[in-house]
A protein has these predicted regions:
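Gly/Ser/Thr-rich active-site loops/lids in small-molecule metabolic enzymes
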Residues: 155-198
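Short, solvent-exposed amphipathic alpha-helical segments in soluble enzyme
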Residues: 22-26, 54-56, 146, 178-182, ...
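A short helix->loop->beta-strand "cap" motif at the edges of active sites that frequently abuts
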Residues: 57-66
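Active-site-proximal helix-loop elements at catalytic-domain edges
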Residues: 9-23, 27, 116-147, 192-193, ...
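ATP/NTP phosphate-donor binding region
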Residues: 1-41, 45-58, 80-102, 114-123
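Catalytic core of DAGKc-family lipid kinases
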Residues: 72-161
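ATP/nucleoside-binding phosphotransfer catalytic cores, i.e., glycine-rich phosphate-binding loops
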Residues: 123, 131, 147-153, 197-230
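Short glycine-rich anion-binding loops that position phosphate/pyrophosphate groups of nucleotides
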Residues: 43-46, 73, 167-171
Length: 230
């Protein structure tokens, strides 16, 4: 048996869980901090969880683990845009990993400051970072786009929020909101149910500063559609 050290991330769906148990029986299960590879079994959502786990491990160890994503879903609604298809047995995993082409991913970093307490937290988004309402009340935001500390563009958002998408996320939530496609050296900004629909494509070395105006209207920060900060 190969000495590959694999950390598995498996969808909670029973269909994927069964295959996950077979894979762990074949390869064993390695703690992500000691693994050489991360293997995701499921769909796009499971892939994002695996990538977030790999990113968290990188922040602790300084080693970025490759994530190999196996498509394993039995639903017709499943998209699988991030997944590798055609794997039916655990024995195939080693060969497929060795044959795989590496695709670099550049996540977004969101630095959040709660103005009332000056509390600061940072989060990383693989597909997107979203700033949106956390209850059914419109939020108000001032948005600045900066390059090298200088403001290049500014606009105001009155609505449910805004999404900032990476090239990897341009076909996901951002796209469903009506955001236009863009090149791999760009980021996409798209408002959510705003009074004025705004879509902007900006260079990926620009920064986006978002100032939430209304403290009495709760607004949260989400990474890859998972709430992280409010």
């Amino acid at each position: 048996m190969s000495d590959m050290k694999i950390h598995f991330v498996v969808s909670p769906a029973e269909y994927a869980q069964g295959f996950g148990r077979q894979c762990i029986k074949q390869w064993g299960e390695t703690n992500i901090l000691k693994a050489s590879y991360v293997v995701s079994i499921g769909g796009d959502g499971t892939a994002l969880v695996a990538e977030q786990e790999a990113l968290s491990a990188y922040l602790l160890t300084g080693q970025m683990l490759p994530v190999y994503v196996i498509d394993y879903s039995n639903t017709k609604e499943h998209v699988g845009a991030l997944t590798n298809k055609g794997i039916t047995t655990p024995q195939e995993i080693e060969g497929r990993i060795k044959e795989a082409r590496k695709v670099p991913i550049y996540p977004l970093q969101a630095d959040c400051i709660l103005q009332q307490t000056n509390e600061q937290k940072s989060y990383f988004g693989i597909n997107e970072i979203t700033v949106k309402i956390s209850r059914y009340e419109m939020t108000y935001m001032d948005v600045d786009i900066l390059s090298k500390g200088k403001v290049k563009d500014s606009f105001y958002v009155a609505g449910d929020g805004i999404v900032i998408a990476t090239p990897m996320g341009k076909t996901a939530y951002y796209h469903n909101l009506g955001g236009k496609s863009f090149q791999n050296d760009r980021l996409g900004l798209q408002t959510i149910a705003a009074k004025k629909n705004i879509n902007k494509i900006i260079p990926d070395n620009h920064q986006v500063a978002i100032w939430v105006r209304s403290a009495h209207r709760p607004t949260c920060v989400m990474r890859d559609c998972n709430r992280t900060y409010q």
